[in-house]
Amino acid sequence: MDLLLGHNQFLGISHISEERSRERDKKFSDVKNIYKVVEKAVDLGYKGMILETHPRMLEFLKYYKNNETFQIDFYLQLPYIQGYIQKMNEQGLSGLILEIVRRGGIKTLSSTVLKNLINYVKKDYITMAISFLQFERAPFRDINIKAILLHNVVTDLLLSLRISSALEDYNIFVEEKMEIKPGFITLNFELFKKSFEDWNIKPHLVMTPINPGGYDMNPSSSAVETALRNYAGEVIAMNILGGGAFSPSVSCSYLKSFKNIEYCVIGASSNEHLKELIKLFKE
């Protein structure tokens, strides 16, 4: 069972206290501090890192490419849902489209082209969504992307609406056209497993909450546990400490009871925490 470094801690996210959240946000507003933590994680044996197109992570990525004193596999989580919602609220659909297209290296769009794009999105949103994946991935072309993980908001919405074609199109497109391993994030692993089996879709990778308290394990911890023990694919466990509710040793023992968990996501932000966790999981 290998460890992946999470990224929420670098965005100032803490489930323990608002004060800790503010401290993290201040510390990691300087991306050099993110770089130091990731560099130490690699030195200790962490195998990869979760990324998304949050502005701070894009800034970190630029710093990484300019320095690159270590090599690491990146797992890219797409799309950046929070940013999409914020941009839509502030500037509408046209503002969102411009933002995504600019990430792909296109600086300007004529009003006619933009209008045509908006009409296209409204008529064929699935095809356009897949095209946007390429724009979202554009800033990461020069680094080692091990997998693209479809955000749980999108995965679980499509599962609940039973839109199998969109999930299958994504799976095929990422693997065959982008030549990257496709993956999914879900907060309902039982539904994910059953639906993909019913639709005969073969997922390469799935990331889902797994922890001893059943935190975010839907529809229930027992249902997820049963589904996991009967699942043959690769699994990434996230939320393994339940936002700090469970001790690392208890979580580690629990996770090791499942034979098909390939990776665990660790939200560590200090050298001491990084060392403690890798020692536990490698024992």
Predicted regions and their residues:
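Short, flexible/disordered intra-domain loops and linkers
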Residues: 16-28, 87-88, 156-162, 215-219
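Short, aromatic/basic amphipathic alpha-helical patches
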Residues: 61-66, 89-91, 277-281
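Acidic/glycine-enriched edge-of-secondary-structure segments
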Residues: 14-26, 119-125, 180-183, 208-215
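Active-site beta->alpha loop and helix N-cap motifs at the rims of alpha/beta catalytic domains
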Residues: 31-38, 42-48, 52-56, 66-160
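N-terminal binding-site loop/beta-alpha segment at the start of enzyme catalytic domains
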Residues: 1-69, 254
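Short, electropositive alpha-helical surface patch
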Residues: 57-77, 203-207, 259-261
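Conserved beta-strand positions in the central sheet of alpha/beta enzyme cores
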Residues: 4, 48-50, 149, 207, ...
